[in-house]
Amino acid sequence: RIASLEPLALVVIHDEIRTDLASTMGELLAHGVEVKIISGDHPQTVRGVATRVGLPAAPVLLESELAQLSGPAFDQAVRATAIFARTTPAMKRHIIASLAHQGQYVAMVGDGINDVPALKEARLGTAMNDGAQIAKDVSDLVLLQSTLSTLPHALTEGRSITQKIYVSARLYLSRNAMTVLAIV
C-alpha cells in the first residue's frame, strides 16, 4: 500500500537566524565574552542554530541531566557547558543564578515570557523590542531595533567609559593625597 502513495509536497521548517548574528557572535567572542545558549528547544535544533551562528561545537546539556546535579556539581556543569536545551523558565533562572554565584558578570538576552525569571536574575537583562512586553518591562536594556549587533559596540564603549572613570578617580585621589601630605 505504501508503494502506491505519491508525495504531494515537501515541507521544511527551520529557524530564521538574524543576518548579523554570526558576525556579532564573532565580535563578542573576540572581546572575551563567554556566550552560552539556554533554550527550551530540542537539543538538535539548539546545536544547529549554534553552529549556524559560528559558535564552537559543544555538547548540549539537557534540563533532565542538570536536575540530577546539585551544589558544586551543578555549578561545575553550568560553568563548563555552553549550550543548554529543553530548559524551563525556572531552570534558566537557576543557571543564571549559578553563574552569578560563581562571580561571573552575567548578561542575559531574551524576548519571551519564559525568559522573564532569568532576565530578572541577570546582572544585565536585555530584551528585544519586538519581544514580549513583560520581558521589556523587567529588562535593564531594550534593543530598539531588535538587533544584537549593537552589543559589541556597547561593550567597547562601556569598557572605554570605565577606563576613563578609573583614570579620573586615580588622578583625583592622587591630588587629594598630595594635598593631605602638604597640609601635614
Where are these regions (language model features)?
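Conserved actuator
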Residues: 39-52, 128
